[in-house]
């Protein structure tokens, strides 16, 4: 049974957000739940790259859902042993299923194809997007990046085990605003504007608009 204070914290998160570390460190800093699709061939599937998706499935099942299973991560100081372990044997087939989930295709008419082609040039060139969001997965995982590299909020990275963020894959990005792990960018235009300012890209308004159309096409 939840006490009133804990219940109030949970209710404060709102739809689409979750704090998987709250019951570990007691801090209230929920993040957006990332998409479960488009993870095939992506080396690290979580924001902070602690491990493969089976690691995260195990963490959530045991530490969050209180499933009867074992979970051990010395980096977090967690060592839960259950007998019998009803979680670990299920992880491989769950991962296999998750990796079959394809990103949704953009609806017809939802982007300007001519502008998107111009945006592709910006993406691969002056926008420097492809230096980290490398096609066809649009990530450079297993590389991880310090928050300061991209002007990202450092809170989640500091609560995890790596202190860094993976590069989020972009396929299906049109479908899940807001953006960044903390939801600080309401639209893809806001994402582009953030990087244009943070990385001193010097993109024109037209280049930024074209880049948004390309992102909508993925």
PLM feature spans:
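Periplasmic c-type cytochrome electron-transfer domains
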Residues: 1-218
């Amino acid at each position: 049974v939840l006490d009133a204070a804990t219940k109030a914290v949970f209710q404060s998160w709102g739809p689409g957000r979750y704090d998987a570390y709250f019951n570990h460190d007691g801090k209230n800093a929920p993040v957006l739940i990332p998409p479960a699709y488009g993870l095939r061939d992506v080396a690290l599937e979580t924001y902070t790259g602690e491990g493969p998706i089976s690691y995260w499935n195990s963490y959530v099942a045991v530490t969050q859902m209180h499933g009867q299973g074992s979970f051990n991560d010395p980096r977090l100081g967690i060592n839960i042993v259950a007998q019998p372990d009803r979680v670990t044997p299920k992880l491989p087939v769950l991962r296999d299923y998750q990796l079959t989930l394809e990103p949704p295709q953009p609806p017809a008419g939802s982007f300007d194809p001519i502008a998107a082609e111009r945006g592709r040039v910006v993406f691969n060139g002056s926008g420097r997007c492809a230096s980290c969001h490398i096609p066809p997965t649009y990530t450079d995982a297993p590389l991880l990046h310090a928050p300061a590299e991209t002007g990202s909020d450092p809170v989640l990275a500091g609560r995890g085990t790596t202190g860094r963020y993976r590069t989020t894959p972009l396929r299906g990005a049109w479908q899940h605003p807001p953006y960044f792990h903390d939801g600080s960018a309401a639209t893809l235009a806001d994402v582009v504007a953030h990087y244009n300012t943070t990385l001193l890209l010097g993109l024109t308004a037209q280049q930024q608009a074209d880049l948004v159309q390309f992102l909508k096409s993925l």
